[in-house]
Amino acid sequence: MRRILTALAAALMATITALATATPANALAITAGFMITSGGRWCTVSFPDPQNPTIVYTAGHCYKDGITEVSLGNIKIGQFIPEIHDPATDLIAIRLYSNIPSEYSLMSREPLLDPWVPNEGSTVCKYGATTQETCGTVLSVDDTKFAVQMPADHGDSGAPIYERLKPGSKGVHVVGTVISEDPRRPGVIYCSTIGAINNFLSQTWGTDWDMD
């Protein structure tokens, strides 16, 4: 428990630092990788909706029935939308309050580029609220989920998984989101593919939803 609380304190400091170093115009802009809390749980923002800046997404299991308020530290930023919740991809939408903007990027301000399909053996990274950026190898892939050898901890649920064209390049290609750790294989996490998320959100919004 002490290790988790220490990690949580470090994550809060990272979020505060990101806000402090942002320009005034977007100092509170919610990006992929931000830590959010609700009902005593903390999770990670997966990504803002590229077509609707008032919507962001996170892991569905972060929603506790009856508790819709979502906060960033002591700032109330929005509410879960229980109607936009998909157990299959473990995704849920959050509607931001009118005074809370979003930015289509990582916390590092790297823009989110067109999504990619994860491939077995490729190197991917994630930005989680607790462990920040860690990278690892894709172990297996199917139509809706994939497994990655990668460090993660409580609070990283919902974190975006992405690839870079090359080290130091500006912009990342999202390939999925973190669901959970594998209880039988330490250091392995399960993720939803961006393709499965795309299908769910296209049906939900009644349009050809895409991260492009």
Task: Tell where the protein language model's regions lie, with residue ranges.
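Solvent-exposed, flexible loop/coil residues
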Residues: L5, I67, W116
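Secretory targeting and sorting signals
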Residues: M1-A27
